[in-house]
């Protein structure tokens, strides 16, 4: 019996939701909330409705469970990419890689007032976002089109049901999907003076999103950090040590 399993990664773009955290006060206590997560919950009904329409158009009378991965994953991706769930992709495996970037600008040292003091002034900014399906395997109910020449991105609608629940079973079974987003750095400044003093400042930020499909739970962790470095270069410096 043919089967298929593996993992899937693709460069992505989630910058629209990167700075959306808000605060809410309940009984005098301030909590941080996530507009993207609230949107994810709203998207579930939208995606469920779109899938029902697609199933009806295909002549399939059965329905997905509300927390089926075929509903949750598109709702999750639409929320954290800032797309409208009404017209967002319904695929579980995004098809097109989105370019990430790194920008380095070294022109400030040529400006009047700076070029007499600094030999170099560099600004840096980098962005990286990766969508991961940590592990997938085909449902044992499906044996057709499991060969490698069938693209994962051509994700089909479910057509077979679970004998116990009566709900549609997805063609591929996923345990978890995640998004790793990094600003490395969000802003970085590196300078060197004419007197060989050097300094650098970097503000980095990252976010890790995970959707656990066994319990429909979303976890989000964020980290940020600031680094400073200073240095001085001196030619022909004599150290007071004997060798």
Give names to the regions the model predicted.
Residues 1-243:
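Exposed, low-structure sequence patches enriched in small/polar residues
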């Amino acid at each position: 019996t043919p089967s298929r399993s593996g993992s899937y990664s693709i460069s992505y773009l989630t910058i629209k939701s990167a700075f959306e955290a808000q605060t809410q006060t309940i009984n005098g206590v301030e909590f941080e909330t996530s507009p993207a997560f609230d949107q994810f919950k709203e998207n579930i009904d939208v995606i469920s409705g779109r899938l029902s329409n697609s199933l009806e158009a295909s002549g399939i009378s059965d329905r997905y469970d509300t927390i089926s991965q075929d509903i949750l994953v598109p709702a999750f991706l639409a929320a954290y990419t800032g797309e409208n769930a009404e017209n967002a992709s319904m695929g579980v495996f995004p098809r097109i890689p989105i370019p990430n970037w790194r920008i380095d600008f070294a022109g400030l040292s040529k400006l009047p007032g700076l070029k007499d003091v600094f030999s170099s002034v560099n600004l840096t900014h980098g962005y990286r976002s990766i969508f991961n399906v940590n592990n997938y395997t085909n449902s044992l109910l499906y044996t057709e089109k499991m060969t490698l020449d069938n693209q994962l991105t051509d994700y089909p609608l479910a057509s077979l049901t679970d004998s116990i629940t009566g709900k549609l079973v997805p063609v591929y079974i996923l345990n978890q999907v995640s998004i790793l987003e990094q600003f490395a750095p969000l802003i970085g400044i590196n300078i060197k003076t004419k007197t060989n003093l050097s300094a650098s400042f970097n503000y980095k930020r990252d976010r890790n999103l995970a959707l656990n499909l066994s319990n429909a739970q979303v976890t989000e962790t964020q980290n940020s950090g600031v680094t400073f470095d200073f240095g001085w270069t001196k030619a022909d410096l004599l150290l007071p040590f004997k060798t």
